[in-house]
A protein has these predicted regions:
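Terminal, non-globular segments
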Residues: 1-192
Length: 192
């Protein structure tokens, strides 16, 4: 990502909108025992388009804001979202991010990693983590719901962050060279 005041403003608006929607509406909306976790998808989208450093910073800021707004134990969400942001950003740096359906898999993997890591950290800190088979079902349903909502969230995030991106993954896909039209392979260089 290009570091500028506009970039900080765009990412801040995205995170603030995600946290407000998460706490005011989506956390009360239970679907089959799970819920949509918009903050994880917003952090994953910023990391997917901005890289690992932007993912770490975005994850920490979103987790800190979410912990402050919800009154949860400080640092748990920011620690886990920092790791999720770094992991998604590192994946983007190593792999080609230009496939159109890759946000589905990235959103599912980020959500699954967040749910497992958040449960582990909460259990280690004894923050009232419950151990039950229903928790596993809720984690699977939450991961599937986030996978369904990943594509619209990633598309909206890309449109919001596009002026701040160094490389737009969709432009890479559109600018691929057409196949060369030359003569038969054996006659190259003979200028026939």
């Amino acid at each position: 990502m290009i570091l500028s005041p506009g970039t900080f403003l765009r990412v801040g608006v995205l995170l603030l909108l995600a946290v407000i929607l998460q706490l005011s509406f989506l956390s009360q909306l239970g679907i089959l025992g799970g819920h949509i976790d918009l903050v994880v998808l917003a952090v994953a989208a910023c990391a997917y388009y901005g890289g690992s450093e932007a993912g770490c910073a975005t994850g920490f800021a979103a987790g800190f804001l979410l912990d402050l707004a919800s009154g949860a134990t400080m640092g748990v969400t920011s620690l886990v979202l920092t790791a999720v942001g770094y992991g998604v950003g590192r994946f983007r740096e190593v792999r080609d991010p230009s496939h159109g359906l890759l946000p589905l898999a990235v959103g599912a993997a980020a959500t699954g990693g967040f749910v497992v890591a958040f449960a582990a950290v909460s259990f280690m800190l004894d923050v009232g983590a419950s151990v039950s088979p229903l928790v596993i079902r809720d984690a699977i349903v939450t991961t599937l719901l986030n996978a369904l909502f990943a594509l619209p969230v990633f598309t909206g995030s890309r449109k919001l962050l596009r002026p701040a991106l160094k490389v737009d993954p969709l432009e890479l896909r559109r600018r691929r060279r057409p196949p060369r039209e030359t003569g038969p392979l054996g006659l190259r260089g003979l200028e026939v």
